[in-house]
Each structure stands twice: as C-alpha cells, then as structure tokens.
C-alpha cells in the first residue's frame, strides 16, 4: 500500500514523500524509512494518523487502520536529550562565525556552543528580511539582536520593507519595545496558523470542511510562492510606468494630451474647452454618459477643431466631459484617422499621414494628476538612515 507522509521538522520546514509498504510492516521499521527520507532521527519521530498518535513500535501499520492512499503526519519532537557530537541531519551548513554580532568583537575566538546559539538568530534575521514571520516563540533570539542585524544590512532591510511592512515600520520607529511587540504578535499568529494547519492535516480525510480549508491553504501558498518568484525574477513588474503624454496646441493654447489607444473617442474637459474658447461650438444634442472604470457626464461634442502637434495641424473632434481631471485625451478615433503609431522603442508618437514624430513627455513634465506618487521613497530612505545612525549611537 502507498502511504503519503507529511513531515514537519522542528524548525517548521516541511517535506512530503510517499512510501510503499505492506500492511504488516511494523511501525518501528516504518520510522526507519521515514528517517531516510526526512533526515529526522528515529528517536525524534512521531507518527500521527487520524488525529491519533501511533505509539507501539512493534505493532503493524495495518493494526492501526492504515490502508492504501492514507496520509500520516510526521512531527519531530523537541530535543530528546544530549546527542553525540557531530552535525545533526537537519543542521544548516552555513557558517555564521564571520558575522560580527553587535556588542561583541568579531576577532575574539568563539566557543562552539556560542556559535551554534548565534546561528538561529542569523537565520531568523534572513527569514524576517525575506518577508517570513518567525515561526515559534520557543528558541526566539534577542529582539535587540535581530533589530541590530536588520539595521546593519541595507539589502535585508529593503526586503523587509517590501514583504513585511508592519515589522519594517516598527523597526524604523526607533523603539525596541515597539519592534519586540510586533515581532511577538507575528510569532503568535504564525504559531496559531501552524497549529490549525496540523489539525487540518490530521483530520478525517473525508471531512469536506477540512479538505476545503486545506485546498484554500494550498492556493494561498501557491499565490505567495508566485509573488516571491516574481519579486526575484521580474521585480520591474511591481513598478509603475509613466503614462504617454505629448505636447500639443488647441486654438493656440498649449496642452498636454494623454495618448490612449484604448479609448474609443477623443475627449476634453469642460475647463480645458473654456480655456481654449471652443465651448461656443459644443453641440449639446450629443450629451450622454461616458462609461469606463467609472462614469462621466458628456456635455456635448465639438464636431471639428484643429489640433497642432509639432508643425502639423490636424482635424479632430472632441467630446466634452463635465468633470474630468485631465485636459485632453487622444482616443482611437483621432489616432486611426491620422494613422498614428506608438513607437515605444524610440519613445515617440508617429503621425502616419505626415511622418511627423513627437516625443512622449518624461514624468517631470506630466500634469500633476498623472504623476506617480513622489516623495515617499525619499522619506523612507531618510527614515532608514536615521534609524541606522540612532542604533549606532545607542550601541556605542
């Protein structure tokens, strides 16, 4: 029969594997096979099936009610006692001996026990920076140490701001007490989620509610993994792009027009039409409602006007909107009429009927309503610098 094992190690790392065994296979031998797959020592393995802990090692799996296709949970016990010297199977091979811990000298020789105690703290710092919430309250390193390690590493600090904003905000507040409170609260939440997840995995496989929750958890894990991969492989997808604007003139008045090939018609705001002195030409029989992301009331239509782009004077019609933040939008009707093409490689709008090219405006020249939110990044950088300097003064 095929048994699927869902393994949760002491450090809350997970692994899933399947074992082909017979119903008369003893539990102790099953644990030996699990040790080879999970790298968890036999004496630290706990097997749970249907919310029941399997205790008698000499009993067969069939006597416990296991059958083909069943799922069991493997939990690693806490430290069961002193182990022989040497590397534990799941001990990380990363050497953190070269890390200078705040308050100590990196040149001073370290006792092996001290080095092993520092390693989890360094791992927690890396986990926090990658957006991961620390898993359990037991084995928590000093919040002051974690805070100092994050403040001393700009890369980890930037990752923390992206993936764990509440903790980053507490870190940059300059208050160790606030940072400790947020850290402990996130740990409690993570511990509760882990308990709920273990309860679901050990529940009755035929329980529809439990299966629905497991399905939702798997979906959320896939979403989180997809986002993390995108952050690593395509970080530019999380940035904002500058919209396409060009300089033009209507009735001699300079304007900044938004080029939108997805808009059906060319529109102009009522305020802009009044500045350009073309409100007298508005045909109110064409009043209506423009629908898109929202709705806007159309006052009417200017059937024919001239728009100047560079040295070209082009015929154009405008639908006048009552309450529109941008002055003018060049829609597909105007772009098609004059065979315009958007060349993003050269960053120009090409007028097909005349061959004239006009450059798209940089962000600094865009109307205020279309500029990206600025100033936040600069203030955040100042906060980081202030926190690092403040932390350095406190340590010295």
Curated annotation (Swiss-Prot):
It comes from the Eukaryota. Inhibited by the proteinase inhibitors amprenavir, indinavir, lopinavir, isovaleryl pepstatin, ritonavir and saquinavir. Residues 103-128 have a biased composition (Polar residues). Residues 82-130, 374-396 are annotated as: Disordered. Keywords: Aspartyl protease, Hydrolase, Protease. Its EC number is 3.4.23.-. Coiled coil: none annotated. The active site is at 260. Residues 1-81 form the Ubiquitin-like domain. GO terms for biological process: cellular response to hydroxyurea; proteasomal protein catabolic process; regulation of DNA stability; regulation of protein stability. Residues 379-396 have a biased composition (Basic and acidic residues). InterPro entries: DDI1_N (IPR033882), Peptidase_aspartic_DDI1-type (IPR019103), Peptidase_aspartic_dom_sf (IPR021109), Ubiquitin-like_dom (IPR000626), Ubiquitin-like_domsf (IPR029071). PANTHER family: DNA DAMAGE INDUCIBLE 1 HOMOLOG 2, SODIUM-GLUCOSE COTRANSPORTER REGULATORY PROTEIN -RELATED. Probable aspartic protease. Seems to act as a proteasomal shuttle which links the proteasome and replication fork proteins like RTF2. Required, with DDI2, for cellular survival following replication stress. Together or redudantly with DDI2, removes RTF2 from stalled forks to allow cell cycle progression after replication stress and maintains genome integrity. Belongs to the DDI1 family. This is Protein DDI1 homolog 1. The lineage of its organism: Eukaryota, Metazoa, Chordata, Craniata, Vertebrata.
